[in-house]
Amino acid sequence: MKLYSFWRSLATYRVRIAMNLKGIKPDEVIDINLMKGQQREESFKKVNPMMAIPALVDGEGPALFESLAIMEYLDETHPNPPLLPKDPKGRARVRGLAQIVACDSHPLVVPRVREHLAHEYKFDEPTVMKWAQHWHGAALKALDTHLADKATG
């Protein structure tokens, strides 16, 4: 099992935490330095054409990509301990919370998104920060509201 990783990647942290909880140790961790643009190198594009990490290669076949999909794969192939509750509603709730983080908040810290805002829309750094803070704030407020219920939070 090979994990393509970068130490500053929140998405990779999600996968590494899941692996740690399950006692899974990858055979190899391959560092893809996003700050140096290594995700754009042809060798990595063959692993993940989206040029994003994490990516996981487990045996034969194509690499797995996107942290939530990788975590579901790990949970299905290594069922104990489970990452998700047993009941369908509980699983859906956890997936919804994870998607707020992965889909609504996390992309705002990804360099390629911030670079796109700067180059395509001519946002200066304070404007990018203001934009990101607005959407982060909305996502965190939603998470706080969802997690306020002590029975399910």
Report each predicted region and the residues it spans.
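GST-like domain detector, emphasizing the conserved glutathione-binding G-site
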Residues: 1-128
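Surface-exposed helix-capping loop/turn segments at secondary-structure junctions
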Residues: 80, 145-153
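Short, structured loop/turn "capping" segments at alpha-beta junctions
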Residues: 105-110, 142, 149-150
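Amphipathic alpha-helical packing segments from all-alpha helical-bundle domains
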Residues: 129-148
